[in-house]
Amino acid sequence: MPKPIVAIIGRPNVGKSTLFNRITGGRVAIVEDTPGVTRDRLYRDAEWCGRQFTLVDTGGIATHQDDPLVARVRSQAEQALKEADVIIFLVDSRTGITADDEEIAALLRRSDRPVILVANKVEDFSDPTVTHEFYRLGLGDPVPISAAHGLNTGDLLDRVVELLPAVPAGEEGDALKVAIVGRPNVGKSSLVNRLLGEERVIVSDLPGTTRDAVDTYIRRGEREYILIDTAGMRRKSRITVPTERYSVLRALRAVERADVVLVILDGTEGVTEQDKKIAGYGHEKGKATIIVVNKWDLVPKDERTMDHYREAVRQELSFMAYAPVLFISALTGQRVDQVLMTIDAVGEAANRRVATGTLNAVVREAVLLTPPPSVKGQEVKIYYATQVKVKPPTFVFFTNRPEGVHFSYQRYLENQLRQAFGFEGTPIRLIFRRGRER
């Protein structure tokens, strides 16, 4: 079963993201002075005293603003309340109780979830009156902390652990991490929501609505996935807001920690230079990759349109011919069922190991069929090969002249391995080292 969920709830700018980062041990949520910078739910695993749980940083709940996203953020936070096993309600000890605090408290009192009231930004822990005001919220004893300095957060986590439900041993599966990347407004969040069957990620007509890399857990049958919905990646020259620049960096980091990368293209447009750069980043990091052409419902088409588009993708992204291409509509759900199945397939391919004996039988046959070209009149010999790692599958070939194996012959050997063992959706790495015949 999934880990228990602990949600941090509060109005904008009370320090939710700072606390989230403090507990999870790194700068995960974007922190700025702008109220409401966190607009989606961010998920990250945490541990305290041997107990593991998933921490959720929600967008700030504000009730008296004209921002069109406020209603959506509020809905997101309310959804987090439904999912959470424990709720941390964060208030600001400096500003005291506000109308938003009172409305959130009323919402929490109606909830059947255990709530820990936490007063953040406390400067003088020796002053017993610093939290007295918050008793009138009707949520028990406030816990004073300073998230920015890490003061008293240990006591808070002790309270959290006391309230966590027990997790049966051995029931937490290994979830496949899937980074969903692409230019702004190509439909990344819409695809996540379609896969989930609920609006978990804020979707808006405003480009760049998703500003963080948002982790979302889903389960299909016995398989678990973590979908990492990233901020749209623009060219560096177009990034002017500091928050957006940091979001793009986090999108790149999301690719680094992913098992599978979905590169989302806009089917109403061709493959752009930025699309190539985004896809290339996953390729360089050795990630299993799927090219997902979204908005296919909006494309005027005949019986050859899909083939023509696939050929164009293959031409523009020739460096990753191994990646399957899917044509979907996140809006209508067209062919979205293929996405998780393909994720499973490429994830398995990236983790595939080939027995040394089986591998060398294929290598011997390939070398007999097409021997490596000689270099300056000297014969190049391939003695044997072995697989040294997965994700991506990596093979070391031992030869008398490592520098003499031409890149075209390396490509030939790669094609032979793919023909024999599949590896659809994943890059494979070939390394050539000097060795002797066994």
From Swiss-Prot:
Residues 352-436 form the KH-like domain. SMART domains: AAA. One of its GO terms (biological process) is ribosome biogenesis. GTP 1 binds at residues 10-17, 57-61, 120-123. InterPro entries: AAA+_ATPase, G_ENGA, GTP-bd, GTPase_Der, KH_dom-like, KH_dom-like_a/b, P-loop_NTPase, Small_GTP-bd. GO terms for molecular function: ATP hydrolysis activity; GTP binding; ribosome binding. Residues 4-168, 176-351 form the EngA-type G domain. Keywords: GTP-binding, Nucleotide-binding, Repeat, Ribosome biogenesis. HAMAP family: GTPase_Der (MF_00195). Belongs to the TRAFAC class TrmE-Era-EngA-EngB-Septin-like GTPase superfamily. EngA (Der) GTPase family. This is GTPase Der.
